[in-house]
Amino acid sequence: MQKTILAVAACCACGAVQAQSSVTLYGVADANVEYVNHVGAPPQASNNFNPGPANNVFRENSGGLSGSRWGLRGTEDLGGGLKSVFALEGGFNIDSGLAQQGGRLFGRQAFVGLQTNYGQLIFGRQYTSLFSTVANFVPARFATQYEPAALITGFNYREDNTVKYTGVFGPLTAMAHWTFGAGLTLPRTSPTAVTAGGNGEVPGEFRRDTGYGAALSYGAGLFRLGVGYDQWNPTIGTGSGTYKKAAVMANFGTDKANVSAGYRWGQNRDQNGALLLRDDFYWVGGNYKVLNDLTLTLEYNYQDVKSLAGSPNFTNPWQIAFIADYALSKRTDVYLTTAYAKHAGLALDSAATGYATSLALGNSYALGAGQSSMLGVALGIRHIF
């Protein structure tokens, strides 16, 4: 009898603990078939910085609306309004099964921290404050296929060794972060370009590969405003460069439609203070729910390159992109997306971005030799679990 009572008590205790904690397995599986014209190869030392001849390509990709991923996230109620939180999230190519983010197991996010009524403080690999805020103000929400996320928010939009605070106070959301070492290296993509980045946390080199930023967003009714700043100090040669981004953005939306627009200022300098890149970036677009299950998205991007490697003679690129997304259920949708870029590859991949999109995705959007435009179209399916 006593054993029975103890067993029942143990089961009740376990139930109480489980009620205070949760762990969720989640993910996205997204694949598409794509046609692109005028494709070359990203210029690198291995090909003597030559994009090669232009060709048309028909291929299968992983991630069109969302990067394919899987992850675990959870919370534990510690009492008194205090919770512990964690997330482990890895990206993968669904067309090959290979890990993304350089083969990392949890390359998209990996963090642990605490949460109270006054905000959340987390430690690990995570998104910058600027990226997290801009994501709510771009029409395609950083759709993997053609939206130039790295161009808008910086190549370092994910950083290792980061401490980040997020607080929500009514209509105001505040974020701030510091990274001890971003864990990112940008390869040379032209004879005059520099190799930038590293792991950071170097003894005696407090500034090397560090980064920081902050952002605010405010929403009232149908209108929302946001501002953000990000700085990364990558290793360049024997010193540290300074890569800066600042943005202001707005969104107006209803249940059926919304319009977003923004401006981003950017400046990259090397370890000696010499200007590597100075550019302005603009975006505008919107979403319209034609039917309960059909949403259309249109977006225009323009990059005004003031100076690249000391030269002002860079033809400014622009892109227009369209998405038709049809929901088969709450978790599965099919989509058609197309984009046209001028004076750059799709996602505005060019020397001014270090061909970040091509190198990150593994599928080139670099313009082939002698070309000035690129057209792409993709048909895909996404399942969220």
Functional labels for PLM-detected ranges:
Residues A54-S68, L105-R108, Y157-N161, V168, ...:
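Residues that define the transmembrane beta-barrel architecture of outer-membrane proteins
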Residues V23-A31, G80, S84-L88, L121, ...:
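Transmembrane beta-strands of outer-membrane beta-barrel proteins
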Residues L328, A369-F385:
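Outer-membrane beta-barrel "beta-signal"
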Residues R207-A327, A339-Y340:
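Detector for outer-membrane/organellar transmembrane beta-barrel domains
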Residues S21-Y35, P53-G181, S217-G221:
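Outer membrane beta-barrel
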Residues G71-R73, F111-G113, K164-T166, A215-S217, ...:
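Outer-membrane beta-barrel architecture
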Residues A31-N37, G90-I94, Y127-S129, P171, ...:
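Transmembrane beta-strands of outer-membrane beta-barrel pores
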